[in-house]
UniProtKB/Swiss-Prot annotation:
FMN binds at residues 62-67, 77-78, 83-84, 106, 141-142, 186, 196. Homodimer. InterPro entries: Pyridox_Oxase, Pyridox_Oxase_CS, Pyridox_Oxase_N, Pyridoxamine_oxidase_dimer_C, Split_barrel_FMN-bd. Substrate binds at residues 8-11, 67, 124, 128, 132, 192-194. GO terms for molecular function: FMN binding; pyridoxamine phosphate oxidase activity. One of its GO terms (biological process) is pyridoxine biosynthetic process. This is Pyridoxine/pyridoxamine 5'-phosphate oxidase. It comes from Shewanella sediminis (strain HAW-EB3). PANTHER family: PYRIDOXINE-5'-PHOSPHATE OXIDASE (PTHR10851:SF0), PYRIDOXINE-5-PHOSPHATE OXIDASE (PTHR10851). Its cofactor is FMN. The keyword DNA-binding does not apply.
Amino acid sequence: MSKLSDIRREYTLGGLHKEDLPGDPIELFSKWMEQARDSEVLSDPTAMSVATVDADGQPFQRIVLLKRFDKGGFVFFTNLESRKSQQIAINSKVSLLFPWHSLERQVAITGEAEPLSTAEVMKYFITRPKESQIAAWVSKQSSKISARQALESKFAEMKAKFSQGEVPLPKFWGGYIVKPTSIEFWQGGEHRLHDRFLYSKENSGWDISRLAP
């Protein structure tokens, strides 16, 4: 068995310099996201880790797809009865991480998650493929199930039920916007001298600090 301690590589794709940074982190995130989408080395550039904590302070993470972002925040959709939603109801402070390994980059975001309005959720829900809309009705996310067959049987049942017409929006399905309080950009550097810049939200705008790697 190979030793994990022997696995290493150099980071050589480029650096990040403070004089090149925009005053608004969303501008830099938009640029990096566009580059991630245009690259041919990332299959899921919008995939992000969403970290929440439960009532006991136990953290949990899961991969969720980013569906929209702007100066107001970062949007994702989910089952409102899921573990993540239950934890957000207890503590709305969350963390997001975009691990763009192939580009030697990552973006870490902290902020508060706020529920989206039903109108905002519906606007997105109707754009989903019909099978995905049906799947939203099928899965009681994070609950225990006896076997995959139970899930597939329920899907077949709901597919028949909604075979004619539009699939209605489940009351237990919605979304959140994470309003950022900090955004950190990490760019890999040679000899582990990585570039890290932290944008911290202030009343007058954003403070930018370089962090030691």
